[in-house]
């Protein structure tokens, strides 16, 4: 298909200059197509699989803690491609057209070839894949397959679960990587060594791999929004994961990782599912670890695994059964990182001096040393050790080599009473890792979520089998059910709780939020980003419910209360106010006292301050100058972001110079004062200068 795409692009360029008719339209369409291809190229270099579920997840999840500097080369190439995408516009500007006739036929040919190019491009493939994965499907047939562990553990052994970042078993291949991983290869001969372990859709990046292995479900999101983790109160609240079960069995669950736990919602997941302690990069900063032990992603693995060893000893001495989970980081794509403990260690390879190979060699040694420490300790006999890759390696400096190999995840189980064996799976995935561990703990237990023990010969149907059978045509049913784990299935009643969060089923979401229901009033989509734009552009056959401050919907609302605008499938509308939302509203109730007509263009808050500021009590005058501003009046507010309180609000009209003046009175000191404007999504405001000046009364001299 690549040659077809290339040919279509060349023909599109020729058709662009073949006739001056509609030349700018043709150039704009071609530039847009090239721009989308450039974006796809960047995403593909980051994900290794084009635009997939991981891409959508990270577009919405918290990106704090991402080592963006590692991808500067990819970003530089993308900028170059971005500039190249504009070349059709330049070509139209400088080209002198020689054949003014036949413009209609040329334009028709251009449109036809553009459609061919789109069909031949990876954009069409990925769009089609996402459509089939995210489209509404009936998941009723797979509901009985979702099973949670119930029976008690008779032997509560300690567990140490070591996730190796992108440390797939493919690196064990001695023909391709001789002597690269001698320590883990040796441990594999003493362990239950699971082979041919795949990553299904929804398990192919770090947080997804952890969710899949510990919960037995693929990581999807609140239906359709691909997850804004900073706005969700709970991470998969309806799922019952390994940490939940072990906590009920009297375990203490402890996590230590080198990266920022807020990245992609990892910390939220762990704290929502039975983990008592979550230590991340901030823990090591608090311990005073020197800067030389950190990379762009967090603390290096030598420091991390030393801390894991200390934690293991502390937890073991306490006497309470525990699961200690750790996640390495230095083998992260694209090039890996080398900690100080391995600075003198090199891996000689015919492939060349590749930094990632040195990092993998180091990780093999450091993990091997931690495992040896645990096994040789007086607590080792009562400990099961799990060594697993979180997912297959993403695009890295070895991608060309890995592409020629049979890829498989790493999964080893080591323990005193665990007989070494190699388990050859035909349709196993990381969804089955947790269930396999449970069978090793308690032989009668073989299921966790949609996961099935890979040691059970009579395992019932599973999501892993569905993903590998008939091109995965039944797998979207599992994805659809997994999406309901974010909110539950009773989602027709909405209310605002005391914290100002919207309660949807079992989930709590910080507004603004737009909920789309299908014609049967089943929750179809939750929008958490660009909600006002989505509300304006979503043409639903069911019901829409938009929850935000009343200021979003009304010109005369200055009380800071919450409102919900409900639009049914007949386009009848009703605005519910704070008292109604506190009691709860049913989105499937008939809309009495409704209004008809076009939907209002709702406003959204735009922050004017760069950061929250501590402000003492008193009277102030807010002065700001807006270089770019709406042509009509709009609301400006002073708010306390954490307490979610509107402190002052005024309907403002900038003067000719763009100046806005507004009094702000504070009865008490505020730790987190912010200034924001309410605009619809087509409007913008750009503030050049902003000052909050204390209003000092003039003394009476009479």
Swiss-Prot record:
Transmembrane stretches, start-end: 2-22, 71-91, 103-123
Protein localization: Cell inner membrane
Gene giving rise to this polypeptide: opgB
Catalytic reaction equation(s): a phosphatidylglycerol + a membrane-derived-oligosaccharide D-glucose = a 1,2-diacyl-sn-glycerol + a membrane-derived-oligosaccharide 6-(glycerophospho)-D-glucose
NCBIfam families: PRK12363.1
UniProt-listed GO biological process terms: glucan biosynthetic process
Gene Ontology cellular-component terms listed: plasma membrane
InterPro entries: Alkaline_phosphatase_core_sf, OpgB, OpgB/LTA_synthase_biosynth, Sulfatase_N
Keyword annotations from UniProtKB, A to Z: Cell inner membrane, Cell membrane, Membrane, Transferase, Transmembrane, Transmembrane helix
UniProt name for this protein: Phosphoglycerol transferase I
Membrane topology listed for this record: Multi-pass membrane protein
Function: Transfers a phosphoglycerol residue from phosphatidylglycerol to the membrane-bound nascent glucan backbones.
């Amino acid at each position: 298909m690549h040659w077809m795409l290339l040919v279509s692009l060349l023909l599109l360029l020729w058709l662009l200059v073949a006739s001056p008719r509609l030349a700018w339209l043709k150039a704009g369409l071609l530039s847009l197509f090239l721009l989308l291809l450039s974006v796809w190229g960047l995403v593909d270099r980051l994900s290794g699989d084009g635009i997939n579920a991981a891409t959508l997840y990270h577009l919405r999840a918290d990106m704090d803690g991402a080592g963006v500097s590692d991808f500067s080369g990819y970003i530089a190439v993308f900028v170059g491609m971005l500039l190249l995408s504009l070349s059709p516009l330049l070509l139209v500007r400088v080209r002198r057209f020689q054949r003014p006739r036949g413009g209609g036929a040329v334009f028709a040919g251009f449109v036809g070839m553009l459609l061919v190019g789109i069909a031949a491009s990876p954009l069409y493939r990925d769009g089609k894949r996402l459509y089939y994965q995210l489209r509404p499907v009936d998941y009723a047939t797979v509901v009985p397959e979702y099973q949670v562990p119930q029976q008690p553990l008779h032997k509560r052994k300690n567990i140490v679960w070591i996730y190796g970042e992108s440390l797939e078993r493919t690196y064990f291949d001695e023909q391709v990587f001789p002597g690269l991983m001698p320590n883990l290869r040796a441990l594999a001969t003493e362990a239950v060594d699971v082979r041919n372990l795949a990553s299904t859709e929804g398990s192919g990046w770090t947080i997804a791999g952890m969710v899949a292995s510990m919960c037995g479900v693929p990581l999807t999101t609140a239906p359709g929004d691909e997850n804004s983790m900073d706005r969700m109160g709970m991470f998969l609240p309806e799922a019952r994961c390994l940490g939940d079960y072990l906590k009920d069995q009297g375990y203490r669950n402890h996590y230590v990782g080198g990266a920022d736990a807020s990245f992609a919602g990892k910390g939220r997941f762990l704290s929502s599912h039975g983990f008592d302690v979550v230590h991340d990069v901030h823990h090591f900063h608090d311990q005073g670890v020197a800067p030389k032990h950190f990379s762009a992603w967090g603390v290096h693995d030598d420091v991390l695994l030393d801390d894991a060893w200390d934690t293991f000893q502390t937890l073991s001495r306490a006497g309470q059964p525990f699961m200690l989970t750790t996640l390495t980081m230095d083998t992260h794509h694209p090039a890996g990182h080398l900690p100080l403990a391995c600075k003198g260690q090199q891996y000689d390879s015919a492939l060349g001096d590749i930094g990632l190979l040195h990092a993998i060699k180091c990780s093999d040694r450091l993990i091997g040393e931690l495992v040896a420490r645990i096994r040789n300790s007086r607590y080792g006999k009562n400990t099961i050790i799990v060594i697993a890759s979180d997912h297959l390696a993403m695009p890295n400096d070895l991608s060309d080599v890995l592409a020629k190999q049979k890829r498989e995840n790493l999964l080893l189980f080591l323990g005193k009473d665990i007989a070494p064996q190699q388990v050859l799976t035909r349709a196993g995935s990381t969804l089955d890792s947790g269930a396999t561990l449970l069978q090793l703990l308690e032989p009668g237990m073989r299921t966790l979520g949609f996961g099935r023990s890979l040691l059970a010969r009579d395992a019932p149907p599973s999501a892993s089998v569905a993903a590998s059978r008939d091109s995965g045509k039944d797998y979207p049913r599992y994805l659809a059910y997994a999406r309901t784990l974010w909110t539950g299935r009773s989602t027709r009643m909405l209310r605002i709780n005391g914290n100002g969060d919207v309660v949807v089923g079992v989930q709590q979401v910080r507004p603004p939020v737009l909920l789309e229901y299908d014609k049967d009033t089943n929750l179809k989509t939750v929008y958490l980003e660009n909600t006002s734009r989505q509300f304006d552009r979503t043409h639903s056959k069911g019901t829409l419910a938009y929850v935000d401050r009343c200021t979003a919907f009304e010109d005369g609302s200055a009380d800071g209360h919450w409102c919900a605008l409900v639009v049914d499938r007949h386009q009848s509308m009703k605005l519910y106010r704070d008292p109604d939302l506190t009691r709860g509203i049913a989105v499937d109730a008939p809309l009495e006292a409704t209004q008809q007509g076009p939907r209002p263009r709702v406003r959204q808050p735009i922050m004017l301050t760069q950061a929250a500021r501590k402000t003492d009590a008193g009277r102030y005058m807010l002065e700001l100058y807006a270089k770019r501003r709406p042509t009509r009046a709009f609301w400006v507010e002073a708010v306390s972001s954490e307490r979610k309180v509107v402190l002052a609000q005024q309907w403002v009209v900038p003067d000719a110079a763009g100046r806005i003046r507004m009094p702000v009175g504070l009865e008490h000191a505020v730790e987190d004062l912010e200034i924001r404007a309410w605009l619809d999504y087509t409007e913008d405001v750009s503030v050049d200068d902003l000052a909050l000046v204390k209003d000092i009364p003039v003394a009476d001299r009479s």
